[in-house]
From Swiss-Prot:
Pfam families listed in its UniProt record: TetR_C_6, TetR_N
DNA-binding region coordinates: 31-50
InterPro entries reported for this sequence: BetI_C (IPR039538), DNA-bd_HTH_TetR-type_CS (IPR023772), Homeodomain-like_sf (IPR009057), HTH-type_TetR-like_transc_reg (IPR050109), HTH_TetR (IPR001647), Tet_transcr_reg_TetR-rel_C_sf (IPR036271), Tscrpt_rep_BetI (IPR017757)
Protein name: HTH-type transcriptional regulator BetI
Residue ranges constituting the HTH tetR-type domain according to the UniProt record: 8-68
Encoding gene, per UniProt annotation: betI
Keyword Ribosomal protein: no
PROSITE patterns: HTH_TETR_1, HTH_TETR_2
GO terms of molecular function: DNA-binding transcription factor activity; transcription cis-regulatory region binding
Coiled coil regions, renumbered to chain: none
PANTHER family referenced in this protein's UniProt entry, alphabetically: HTH-TYPE TRANSCRIPTIONAL REGULATOR BETI, HTH-TYPE TRANSCRIPTIONAL REGULATOR RUTR
Keywords: DNA-binding, Repressor, Transcription, Transcription regulation
């Protein structure tokens, strides 16, 4: 968490620089020196306000998560409360559009996932994000399925989102958002059909 007093105009500048450097050289080689040069600030500013590279990565991920949450919330607000299938699609879509689909954002996500396995603070951020996604999905799926079925399908969709993201970061062409939506919707439709026959 950045210290109080960090000029608000500098945060986006540093977050953008962090992602650009990670995109170019990878997380391990993304030094404070390279990031500060990319952002046009002194290394002292980063160390003072963020306590170093770890703090800056944490703030970068917080910003990515804020953008993701804002995108999904905005899409859901634009839809009727009872348009459950559309709302599920909006949740899925929010993970693959605009800011989230940028290659440098995808690579930062991958670095974050890798780091979060061994870092409690980053692991906590990952859990918050996972819980939020599952909560959104469960809420809509429970209107279409039993609670147990909704839980299984929510985890299935979340796993597909994560898997497609991972494959996208390793693909030189990046994430293919249209294909991702087709794959996940195919899974969702098959699950809804399968469970409707079990009633």
């Amino acid at each position: 968490m950045p210290k109080v007093g960090m000029p608000e105009i500098r945060k986006p500048q540093l977050v953008k620089a962090t992602m650009s450097v990670i995109d170019r050289v990878g997380l391990h080689a993304a030094s404070i020196s390279l990031i500060s040069k990319e952002a046009g600030v002194s290394t002292g500013i980063i160390n003072h306000y963020f306590g170093g590279k770890h703090g800056l990565l944490e703030e970068t991920m917080r910003e990515i998560l804020r953008q993701l949450s804002s995108t999904i919330t905005g899409k859901l607000r634009a839809l009727p409360a009872d348009a459950h299938h559309q709302r599920i699609n909006a949740i899925i879509d929010g993970n693959f559009v605009g800011y989230q689909a940028e290659n440098k954002v995808a690579k930062t996500w991958l670095a974050f996932w890798s780091y979060s396995m061994h870092d409690e603070q980053l692991k906590r951020l990952q859990r918050v994000n996972e819980r939020r996604l599952l909560s959104h999905l469960r809420r809509e799926l429970k209107a279409l399925l039993s609670a147990e079925q909704a839980e299984l399908v929510a985890h299935g969709i979340a796993s597909l989102i994560d898997g497609i993201w991972l494959r996208g970061t390793l693909n030189p062409q990046g994430i293919e958002a249209d294909k991702a939506r087709i794959i996940i919707n195919d899974y969702l439709d098959k699950q809804l059909t399968f469970y409707s026959h079990k009633i």
